[in-house]
Amino acid sequence: MNKKVVIVSAVRTPIGSFMGALSTVTASQLGAAAIKGALDKISLDPKHVDEVIMGNVVQAGVGQAPARQASRYAGLPDSVVATTVNKVCASGMKAVMQAAQAIQIGDAEVVVAGGMENMSLIPHYVQMRTGAKFGPATMIDGLQKDGLTDAYDNNAMGVCADLCATEYQISREDQDAFAIESYQRSARAWDAGKFDNEVVPVAVPQRKGDPVMVTKDEEYTNVRLDKIPSLNAVFTKEGTVTAANASTINDGAAALVLMSEDKANELGLKPLAYIKGFADAEQEPKWFTTSPAKALPKALDKAGVSKDQVDFFEFNEAFSVVGLANMQILGLDAEKVNVNGGAVSLVHPLGCSGARIIVTLINVLEQNNGKIGAAAICNGGGGASAIVIEKA
């Protein structure tokens, strides 16, 4: 059994800056907003949903079963199965892949999948289980430890990005130019209304008065492009990665509704896209930056599609050098990659991003009369995930 899988709805929340507009909304509540938005967009009764699969990376303090929380907060029945996925930055994409697999083999007919993260609310840890025998107790930043640090050599992810820049001879100037272009593309896309169809608002409760509705991304306006070339490197002494040519710390969620083509026909729902193929890849952890260049060819092969047949690509810009290196390795045209900007400007809530780039890709195909799209995202530990879709 290998049923055709279609995406019938795909949305994301606005992405909030670190300690910004969405900083008080938990990851699960952000996920709920995305799930509800995805279902409401197609007027789908939640009773039809068999399962919810959501990526979420740093789960400390979020509470038991974050995906289950998001499902219930979105108003789905208690009978809906819920699973949380942690594949670091690729979690949201892996959730979509697992949803597709469940539908392909007949385990489910309708699955909501995506990802969510509130990086502003990630706590600090202190080991007090056995007590501090003497002197002060040391606090550990959960965001740094569980989200942004290699588990094997304890280096920041940015150290690996600097290594990648050296290996592929990508200059500081190239990275800064890439970052500036990312910000400019995002600003143009927002000004042209190109994100209007994919973004659902989030109501943020206030201490007094009515909730504030957050409707737009924050980060792409929080930049002075003229200052980018003057910033210092932040990870290694002779490095080229800066705060501006890397993605930032953020809050947000994305959700997609997947179902079998037969079920979509039964419910009278028009597919947005078909899932053609997907794949994962792994290599040595310090080279996670180029793992998308290993995962994407595998996904294309499974989809029966050549690189040249792909109209548009979405690569998660964890760092500018990630986009540049993978385009270099794969020989891609920059005009076909992240045409509405990428994570450097649209930002990178860890568990959300893998799903977010699929949502954006669907809209890019629609806006630009494209047919085939491919998305790929690297993840800490040496991995990456990639997916190929075809506009319906």
Regions found by a protein language model. Give the residues of each.
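Condensing-enzyme catalytic core mediating Claisen C-C bond formation in acyl metabolism
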Residues: 1-26, 223-290, 294, 301, ...
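Conserved active-site "lid/cap" helical segment
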Residues: 1-62, 66-74, 81, 163-172, ...
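N-terminal extracellular/periplasmic Venus flytrap/periplasmic-binding protein-like
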Residues: 12-13, 24-33, 41, 174-262, ...
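Conserved catalytic cysteine-centered active-site region
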Residues: 56-110, 151-156, 222-248, 329-356, ...
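Active-site-proximal alpha-helical scaffold in enzymes
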Residues: 87-117, 165-194, 255-262, 327, ...
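Flexible glycine-/small-residue-enriched beta->alpha junction loops
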Residues: 110-163
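Active-site pocket-lining segment
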Residues: 159-162, 195-198, 206, 276-345
